[in-house]
Swiss-Prot record:
The gene is SOP4. This is Protein SOP4. Residues 213-234 are cytoplasmic. The chain crosses the membrane at residues 192-212. It is found in: Endoplasmic reticulum membrane. GO terms for cellular component: endoplasmic reticulum membrane.
Amino acid sequence: MNFVLFCFLVWQFVNPGAAFDIKGRLDLKVRNVSRHDISRTYFNLYRIRNPNDDSEWDSYSQSSKLENINGEFTFSDVPIDTGINRTTYFTLHSHSNEFNLKPNRILIQIVGNGQDQEPNLSAFENRFGREYFPSPDITYPETLNPLPLDSANRLTITTMNKQPYRKYIKIRNPGILESGPIASVLRSKFKLAGVVTVIFLVLFPILLEKFDPETAKAMRQEKMHRENAKYVSK
């Protein structure tokens, strides 16, 4: 029994790697997360090789989906190096069929503090084309902005303000109120005002004749007098 315990301690000393959970949350801002969003949103995590580490390295990847309507997701038992000041890098890719997520690429940096201590996790807003570069300190073309973690030490992913939704279905035959001359009139304030004026001029005599025939008769007589006055003056 003592020999088994001794071998276990030696293995822990030689191989300081351990499992770690990376947690995140999706914040839609415009509304709450729905069951439909859960089925159409997912995240991929890839480990990046540290160029300063000459030890044996194996590729690693993991996928995760939203767990609940709070937008939470977790990458469980992610292998990291817990040695003191030993750094492990990951890149996180965000995918959704409904939204344009921000940041779409995240560089995750985990620095070990020893076998019995919680490692330090830092995140940076990454960009397309350099998501597999394992360092936030690159000076060309630009440095990466830190991504703040929330009170529960989770990554926060949001939607882009200018393009929050994606439309994959285009209506081939829209209604008359959405396309054509009628839609053009309804979308233009000046055209709509002109049409309303013409309709009013056409309907006003008819409505006046129906609801106030005496006034309509007086107006016709006044018009006849003006016409007769023109001929008399000539």
